[in-house]
Amino acid sequence: IRLLCSDWHINYSAKKLKGKVKDKLALQKEFGLPQRKDVPVLAMVSRLTAQKGFQLVVSEMQNLVQFDVQVIVLGTGDANFEHDFRYFADTYPGKVGAAITFDVGLAQRIYAGADMFLMPSAFEPCGLSQMISMRYGTLPIVHQIGGLQDSVQPFNPVTGEGTGFGFHDFSGFYMMQEIQEALRLYSEPAAWTKVVKQAMSQDFSWETASQEYLNMYNELV
């Protein structure tokens, strides 16, 4: 994850975020979307399968595009989902961009240029994408289960703490609630930037994980 954060696709850091706007505008251009730095970009990079929760996304896409947001999808998988996202890109030009392919370089450009990263997985033992997205300053919106629950701290509007957004019940309704919460926070630039910096500052190294397990063991004994 540290290596990804230092690749040439990143032109910014937690202390200096202005370069992320350039990556965003370039990403919008690459997907044929209007180049607007003010509109939030919600991205998904994943296998297009039911295990990854794409049935929720498909069921809510009509609702999602009613908001001032651009949606980008990269991935391959179930033929029905591939068809669905091609259809959405054709039906909602300027709102939805889809690349039904596997492309590591494009995935990195999406991580770097997007504002939000959606992971509504039905189950996820570990998951890396949410950690990568945080390192890129792209806030994850996740179904709080398994590794997603362990690695993403949901935003608390009272304290301002958090590294992303999460919903407990596996349903399109609750997923949309969290997306709307993310959009609301995005409309408050100072508060949004604070959470982005908190997410980028997370340490997912093995050294940190080992120390946390050791501390937990010591507490138990």
Regions found by a protein language model. Name each.
Residues 1-221:
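Catalytic cores of carbohydrate-active enzymes across secretory and cytosolic contexts
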